[in-house]
Regions:
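Patatin-like phospholipase
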Residues: 1-165
Length: 165
């Protein structure tokens, strides 16, 4: 139920397992094993690893968000909780982590907004409504992609200035 930060620079097979684990979304992908330990997407426990970046002593932090300013996650409904409990009955800590993810995310966003306001971090986020994870409409996807492209061109100079201060 806790986030771990794995790395690998020698064993390509282990690296692939880590990549598989990092993209193992609940109910959509199987639990992945790395070194005999079951893992799922670390974003469940640490959606935006801002505290980790600060603990590591990074003095320049760039946060790329996928949601609009002011977005907050809502708590999952009871039926969803029951579904997770059934699917992951062997992993009660995972279920607990999934069900409290919104509170952790919202706390992280509060910290990010504070640090951004203080000029301590650089944040890039969409300014238009996002597309859903399951979006298939090419025009909507293209529109959102182009927004990101234009936004980055607009923010690029500010990013360079932040990184070079």
């Amino acid at each position: 139920g806790a986030a771990e930060y794995l790395s690998e620079d020698k064993d390509p097979e282990r690296l692939m397992k880590i990549c598989r684990a990092s993209s193992s979304m609940p109910l959509a992908a199987p639990i992945a094993n790395v070194d005999g330990i079951p893992y799922m997407d670390g974003g469940l426990a640490d959606s935006i690893p801002i505290e980790y970046a600060l603990e590591k002593g990074n003095d320049k932090i760039v946060v790329v968000l996928t949601r609009n300013p002011g977005y907050r996650k809502k708590r999952a409904v009871k039926a969803t909780e029951q579904l997770y409990k059934r699917a992951y009955k062997k992993y009660p800590n995972l279920v607990r982590t999934i069900m409290t993810r919104n509170a952790v995310y919202n706390k992280q966003m509060k910290l990010i907004e504070k640090l951004e306001e203080e000029g301590k971090i650089f944040v890039i986020r969409p300014l238009i409504p996002t597309v859903s994870r399951m979006e298939k409409d090419y025009d909507k996807l293209q529109h959102f992609y182009m927004h990101g492209n234009r936004l980055m061109k607009k923010e690029y100079q500010g990013l360079l200035e932040y990184l070079n201060e």
